[in-house]
From Swiss-Prot:
The protein's name in its UniProt record: UDP-N-acetylglucosamine--N-acetylmuramyl-(pentapeptide) pyrophosphoryl-undecaprenol N-acetylglucosamine transferase
Chain segments annotated as coiled-coil in the UniProt record: none
EC number: 2.4.1.227
Species for this entry: Bartonella tribocorum (strain CIP 105476 / IBS 506)
Gene3D superfamilies documented for this protein: Glycogen Phosphorylase B
Length: 378
């Protein structure tokens, strides 16, 4: 018989929602808890830290502006997910239920609230997502990755930060070195799952506009979602050394060795750039809900840790000018890298686990905030 206390974490079936849940699960297991995951079918290809016994798929759907029948179908799907969550909770008897965003987190968190279980949500972005926005009204505590400590829920918001991978923490130990003279210039480009195709077009156009000296210095590592072979040929024809692939297993290490990064501004990307401490040009994904990527990027830009340009304002000429500036101003790169690292939160996983244990122990939120998180927030 398993005498460990059970904690249930619920997350949408994408990497951005799942990763912080998995990171917390690893930490909580080390502290003696039995941790389960509730998610949807999409997660099967992402989940790495939960076995089948501890992974539970519930029915879920996303609200969209479409036909009334689709709306009815969505509501029925969520109701079904609530029933599945109710049966699971009666079986597991969790002492804590945490949500990490995405609609699959809504049914279990809503049922947990009705069952008077201790609950919290974790919001990775600077702007709260739709599911978390509703759940924020009812849960006991809100853990903020990039959230502002102010607002309607300030009294129950704890600034834990966003958990980062162990590989990122290891990469953060590598000091930043800005290249000088004729030294190679490592340029890392990644766009995540959203909008990487934009970079596949504009980056080679910008590289073609560089002068010969700076172009020869470039060492490009670029993540793409489309024709990797075609992009490799374009760079080869320009005489540029480049690695192009849909995915890099060692992305954290590549970030550590980058001299300049071009990226979208998803919460995990922004936090990893900050923890490792690398200068970056952030292009918020323009179709992100609630413009959360623009707000994420602004947090890093305000302290001088990154530059921001909207996609509509980024031309090949503009990017070429910024690349030229980066190649020729190593002191500015070092200043930006230092500013980014100062706001990194490498201990977010530990902070999140501390919060979870304090909630289980029945501690007052005011005490938790004062004793555990006031120092972390500064």
């Amino acid at each position: 018989m398993n005498d460990k206390k059970v904690i249930v974490l619920a997350a949408g079936g994408t990497g951005g929602h799942l990763f912080p849940a998995e990171a917390l699960a690893v930490e909580l297991r080390q502290r003696g808890y039995d941790v389960h995951l509730i998610t949807d079918e999409r997660a099967r290809s992402f989940v790495r830290r939960f076995d089948e016994e501890h992974t539970h798929i519930v029915s879920s759907a996303t609200f969209t502006r479409c036909h009334p029948f689709a709306l009815i179908k969505t509501i029925l799907s969520l109701l079904k997910g609530m029933g599945q969550s109710l049966r699971l909770f009666y079986k597991l008897r969790p002492v804590l239920v945490g949500g990490f965003g995405g609609y699959p987190s809504f049914p279990p968190l809503f049922i947990a609230v009705l069952m008077r279980r201790v609950t919290f949500i974790h919001e990775q972005n600077a702007v709260m997502g739709r599911a978390n926005r509703v759940l924020a009204i009812f849960v006991r505590a809100i853990a903020g990755g990039l959230l502002s400590p102010k607002g309607a829920y300030a009294h129950k918001t704890l600034l834990t930060g966003n958990p980062v991978r162990e590989a990122v923490l290891k990469a953060a130990e590598i000091p930043y070195h800005s290249p000088v003279g004729e030294e190679p210039f490592n340029f890392l480009v990644f766009g995540g799952s959203q909008g990487a195709s934009f970079f596949s077009h504009i980056v080679p156009e910008a590289v073609a506009l560089l002068d010969d000296q700076n172009r020869k210095r470039l060492r490009i590592v670029q993540q793409v979602r489309g024709d990797a072979a075609g992009l490799i040929k374009i760079y080869r024809d320009m005489g540029v050394q480049a690695e192009v692939a849909p995915f890099f297993d060692d992305m954290a290490e590549r970030m550590a060795h980058a001299h300049f990064i071009l990226s979208r501004a998803g919460a995990s990307s922004v936090c990893e750039i900050a923890v490792i401490g690398r200068p970056a040009l952030l292009i918020p994904y323009p179709y992100a809900l609630d413009y959360d990527q623009a707000e994420n990027a602004a947090l890093l830009a305000r302290v001088g840790g990154a530059q921001i340009i909207s996609e509509k304002d980024l031309s090949a000429q503009k990017l070429a000018a910024l690349l030229t500036q980066a190649c020729c101003a190593p002191h500015l790169l070092e200043k930006q890298a230092l500013a980014a690292k100062k706001v990194g939160q490498p201990y977010a996983t530990r902070c999140l686990a501390d919060m979870a244990e304090a909630l289980i122990a029945g501690r007052l939120l005011s005490d938790i905030k004062e004793e555990l998180f006031d120092e972390n927030a500064t």
